[in-house]
């Protein structure tokens, strides 16, 4: 009879205690508590208390684990049947995660060349400067050309001008920065979500003049996924080197299956500082506004948006040209319609994207202290693109109409252009070798206005 009672006592051995935060001295709930080497465990209650029964009669190691705190273990050496260890305090730990990209189709983002460069998240925040070129200047194969800080333009693998493409979400940016060194890229980096430098076969998906590659910019526009509640975020910055400051604020408001997104940006930059002092007539002012609405469903989304960007900047003077410099005013308005759909009817393809875009760009150049524009440039671009995308392939088509208008002391005639394109991309893996192939067929008509005079 005594032997039986002894076994019962061993089986009912129990340990209890409390778990607290060493930082705040408050109780911790849902801490995982277990005996190493045994299938015995529990979790702490709201007051931090815990209790484990039927523990082994030998000495044992008791472990405590919860996200945000260091793993803690205590060794219990006692012959007592009822064990109370009092309070256990856990130390905070710093969580260090790799960058996480959230998207509707992360599996479709693997089609890229080893020579590609991608900046997003904290990387683009750390390297953010006023212009695209200045933000990318430390990347491999990137150089800068400029006529003042506002007009800085990237040089990609030694090529400039129209030897590579600048795109916004896969379609042309819509400005005239490639036509002259004093034309600024119509982009403020405070609104950029990511920048991708694309080389190799995949570059043909964006256009035909991609000898050096493509720089594709994705802005903080309509997100791929709907927020569960209203969300606000912003970016502020300043520099005492050129007495500049900037701010960008974005607000998302979800309701039912819809979401409204609105954002505004402002940047003021003083004169560029050189080793010889301030370079006159190099200051700039950027202002922008974006508004859009999107509808989300289980297998897709549809959105429409409008964006406005104005840039007023100066070009420094030179003895060979305008001694006092040139002032330039630029305005670009972009309207977008986007439709994304998950598909199953087309083998090997998972998504279909349709995008319509209209860009109205205007650009006036003034001699400093003059009230009339010496040069007046503008263009209107209408684009319609459809694209099917799979894990290792893309096919699509593009229709684009462009109307170029020039006035003042500028002798390029007004011109109409029509571009029809068919493009495709395929990737195939053979053991340790990945092959990529792409093709693009374009039909382009250029019709300048003529005069009998």
Give residue spans per PLM region.
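Structural motif
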Residues: 11, 16-28
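Short, acidic, small-residue-rich periplasmic hinge/interaction motif at the N-terminus
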Residues: 20-23, 32-34, 65-69, 81-125, ...
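Short, acidic Ser/Thr/Gly-rich low-complexity loop/linker segments typical of extracellular
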Residues: 38-49
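Flexible, glycine/serine/threonine-rich loop segments and coil->beta-strand junctions
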Residues: 109-131, 137, 144-190, 199-216, ...
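Transmembrane beta-strands of outer-membrane beta-barrel pores
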Residues: 219, 236-242, 255-257, 266-270, ...
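Short strand-turn segments of transmembrane beta-barrel domains in outer membranes
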Residues: 219-253, 279-282
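Flexible loop and strand-edge segments within Gram-negative outer membrane beta-barrel domains
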Residues: 269-286, 299-352, 356-381, 409
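Signature of Gram-negative outer-membrane beta-barrel scaffolds
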Residues: 393-453
